[in-house]
Amino acid sequence: MGRPRELEIQARLFRGDFGFEWTTHCGERLRILHFGEWNREAGPDFKNARIEFEKHGIEEGDIEVDWDARDWETHGHAVNPSFANTRLHFYVNAAGAASFARSSDHRHIPQARLFVECPPPPAGKCSSQAVSLEAARTMVDRAAKFRLETKGAAFSSASRLHGANAALFFGIAAGLGYKNNSIPFLLSAQRTGWKAAQGNDVEALLFGIAGFLEPRSFDEADDITKTYLKPLWDSWWKVRDSFSRCVLPRSIWKFSGLRPPNHPHRRIGALASVARNFPKLQKQIGESKEKGFLRFFEELDHPYWTGHWNLSADPLAKPVALVGADRATDLLLNAYLPMLGPEDAAKILRAARGPQASGILERATVWLLGCESREFLRTAWDQQGLLQLYRDFGEASSSEALEKIGGV
C-alpha cells in the first residue's frame, strides 16, 4: 500500500482519527475545538475552525493540510490571499531542512505534523511458524479488546468534534462504502455536512458531491431512471457552483470487483435513505438497542434503489434488500458498538455471529494456525480480533507476533 491520498488524510483528520491535540514544530501545544467545515471555494481545506493555542488562546480561522511541510511554499499558499486567514498548517512528511509558513500579509502560520500510518500489505508468513490453539485464543482475545477500545476512542473523538449523531452518520457512511470505497463515502457525507444531511435535498447533495450526477447519466437513462434523477438534478443545479470544489474526482472511486448490490450508486442511495430516516434509527436504537439498529437496516428501503443496481442498469425482476444482513452486521460492529461503553460493546460482540468470512479472514486463519480452520470465524469478537492481528502483524509469522505482544 502506497502513501494515502491527501483526500483520505483530510477525511480522517476531520473525523478525528488523529486526535485533537498537537504540538507545533515551534513547541507550542494546541487543541482543535472544532474543525469547522469543508471549504467549497478557493483556499485552505477547512474553513471557520476553532483552535486553542497554549500561548495565544482561542483563534478562529482556516486549516490547510498538505503532504509535505514545504508544500506551503511550493504550492504558492504564502502569496495567495485566499490562504490569508489560515491559522494552522498540517503536514505529514517533515522536510529535511527547517520549514516556515507565512501568510500573504507576512503573518507566521503555525505548523504541526500528522503521523499517518502507511502499512505495507501483509506478506502472510505462516505454516511452519504457526502458534498453538491456546496461544491463538489469547492473541485473538487481546486483539479484539484492543480493536474495540480503539474504535470506541475514535468515535468519542468524532463525537466530541461533531456531535454524536454526526459521528454515527459518518460511521455509517464509511461502513456502506466497505473497504473499497470507505473514504469516498466518508468524504461525501462530510462534505454534505450533518446539517444538510437532515434537509430535503440530502440525496441530491450526496449524489452531486459524489460526482454521480453527470449529464450523460441522465441523457442515456431509461424513463424510470430519468423520473428518479430529474428532481435530484433540479436541486443540484441550484447549488452545484457553490459545491464545485467539493465534488469528488472519479479516480477516487473503485467500481471494479464489486458485487452488483454494492455498487457505489446504490450505496449512496442507501446513505440518503439513512439520512432521511435518521429519527427512526434513533427511536429504534432507544427502544431496542442493537436489535433496533439491525431492524432499521432490515426495513430500510428506497423507491428506486431496491429495484436497481446502478443508474445505467435495467430494473431488477424483483426488489432486493437495500442493505443485506452481513452489511448490517458490519455496520453494527463498526458504527454502532463504538458508541457504547467497552463492557456493553464486548458483551454484544462476543454474542454476535460474525458476517460471512471474507478472503482476508481465511488468509488470517492460515497465518495464525498454519491451516484452514473455522475456530475463529464464528463470532464477531473472534473475527475482529483476527483482523486486527493480521493487520498489525501480518508481515511477521504468528509466532513472531506472539513474541511481540508479550507471549501467553
Residue spans for each PLM region:
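Phosphate-end processing signature that detects enzymes handling 5′-triphosphorylated RNA
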Residues: 10-161, 174-175, 193, 320, ...
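Short, mixed-charge, low-aromatic patches
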Residues: 4-6, 125-129, 292-295
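N-terminal "leader" segments that precede or initiate the main folded domain
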Residues: 1-11
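Hydrophobic, aromatic-lined core segments that form the binding pocket/scaffold
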Residues: 141-385, 395-398
